[in-house]
Amino acid sequence: MINRLMIATAAVVLTAPLAMAGPIDSACVRSDRGARNAQLCGCIQQVADRTLSRSDQRRAASFFRDPHQAQEVRMSKSNADNAFWARYRNFATTAEAYCAR
């Protein structure tokens, strides 16, 4: 009986996809709004995985802690910040459309 239980447990562990929260999901869940809707945070992370690099995800996640930082990036004259902001806007628009369903 114990062997069957161990085999069943191993099968579940080995075949289940890894449930690793990304930086956007983690920041969202820790935020005031995210604590009430973990499913939405997961959806937003899925969009981030498709539209942002891991580095961009970490940068975007920091906006949950410090929203003013987003404004600083948006208003920046730096080419790198402007390029990031274009990618971030694409991510936000896509997440809004995809996760609103």
List each language-model region with its residue ranges.
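Short N-proximal segments of mature Sec-exported proteins
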Residues: 22-69
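Compact alpha-helical subdomains of small soluble proteins
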Residues: 50-101
